[in-house]
């Protein structure tokens, strides 16, 4: 009975995301404050995008990379009301990223890095009716992608970040329950993590525990939009510059339609040779068994027949363009 109820709950949230509006509480959210006279220069030399282009009222996507250009974290970077910088990190990365940045502050740097993750909750609101439910709790107009709008829900300050699929709300962790309650009251349905993962994979979005890791570079994980090819030096730039200039991105994120569900980490093969690995896999109510994989070029191209070497045996599959 419990398994059936759980399945029904997951499907209900999934269906509501396609036809109405859902609310998803981001687990273990991360938020950093970066302040000081050298805050821009400090972040500029650590991440991939041009931080000097950051403007008030806008968010900038940028990637913290290692010397070999592997992904350490992905941020939405914003200007705080007091002029400092705020960085929304990947879930679960706030504390580790704060320590990493603090260890990279030089003695002459006039900058501080504070882990403020515990103070802020993050909630995603999306679905065809998302704009309607947000309007009903006082938002005049949903923000465009990368735009930021601030307003009060009752006496609770809320910031909404446009994501393209809906909004990410940043709310005091002490007051989030009341805001979620208001959203539920006007028709936004809570979404489970299981349903969120299915929707994420269907949309072809890389996830923090799967594709956005130090196994991959930003270009391999479809983060081209977070890279500036006109800015000065930053950690990992030489590798990324070679990938761009000489078309040396050896692997790319791809979608797979499968004959059966497979496990994360299973090898993707062509004629018995491993060309990639499964990074996310779900059973979609709309599409059946599907997966995301990082696959060597040119085998990532849509329409390529591949086999997935799962524990139970080889599973036939074909690559598809994203989103599904």
Where are these regions (language model features)?
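Glycine-rich, small/acidic residue-mixed loop/short-helix segments
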Residues: 216, 221-237, 241-324
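Acidic, low-complexity central loop/insert segments
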Residues: 22-24, 30-31, 73-206
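Acidic, proline/glycine-enriched N-terminal capping motif
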Residues: 1-72, 81
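Glycine-centered loop/turn motifs
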Residues: 56-59, 144-151, 204, 209, ...
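Short Gly/aromatic-enriched secondary-structure transition segments
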Residues: 46-49, 183, 293
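Short acidic/polar mixed-charge low-complexity motifs
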Residues: 70-71, 83, 156, 273-274, ...
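Anionic-ligand-binding alpha/beta catalytic cores of soluble enzymes and soluble regulatory domains
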Residues: 170-255
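Residue-level signal for inorganic ion chemistry
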Residues: 36, 87, 125-127, 169, ...
């Amino acid at each position: 009975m419990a398994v059936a109820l759980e399945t029904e709950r997951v499907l209900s949230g999934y269906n509501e995301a396609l036809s109405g509006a859902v609310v998803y509480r981001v687990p273990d959210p991360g938020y950093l404050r970066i302040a000081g006279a050298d805050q821009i220069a400090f972040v500029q030399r650590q991440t991939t995008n041009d931080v000097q282009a950051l403007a008030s009222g806008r968010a900038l996507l940028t990637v913290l990379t290692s010397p070999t250009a592997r992904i350490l974290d992905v941020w939405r970077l914003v200007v705080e009301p007091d002029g400092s910088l705020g960085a929304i990190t990947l879930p679960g990365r706030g504390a580790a990223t704060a320590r990493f940045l603090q260890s990279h502050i030089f003695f002459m740097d006039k900058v501080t890095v504070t882990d403020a993750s515990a103070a802020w909750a993050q909630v995603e609101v999306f679905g065809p009716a998302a704009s309607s439910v947000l309007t009903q709790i006082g938002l005049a107009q949903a923000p465009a992608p990368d735009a930021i709008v601030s307003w009060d829900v009752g006496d609770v300050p809320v910031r909404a970040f446009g994501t393209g699929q809906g909004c990410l709300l940043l709310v005091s962790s002490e007051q989030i329950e009341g805001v979620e309650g208001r959203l539920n009251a006007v028709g936004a349905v809570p979404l489970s993590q299981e349903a969120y993962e299915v929707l994420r994979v269907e949309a072809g979005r890389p996830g923090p525990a799967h594709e956005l890791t130090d196994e991959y570079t930003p270009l391999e994980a479809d983060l081209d939009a977070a890279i500036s090819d006109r800015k000065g030096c930053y950690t990992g730039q030489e590798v990324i510059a070679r990938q761009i200039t000489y078309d040396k991105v050896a692997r790319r994120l791809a979608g797979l339609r499968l004959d059966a569900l497979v496990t994360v980490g299973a090898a993707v093969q062509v004629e018995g040779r491993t060309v990639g690995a499964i990074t996310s896999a779900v059973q979609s109510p709309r599409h059946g068994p599907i997966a995301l994989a990082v696959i060597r070029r040119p085998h990532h191209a849509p329409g390529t027949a591949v086999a997935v070497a799962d524990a139970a045996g080889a599973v036939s599959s074909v690559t598809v363009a994203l989103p599904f």
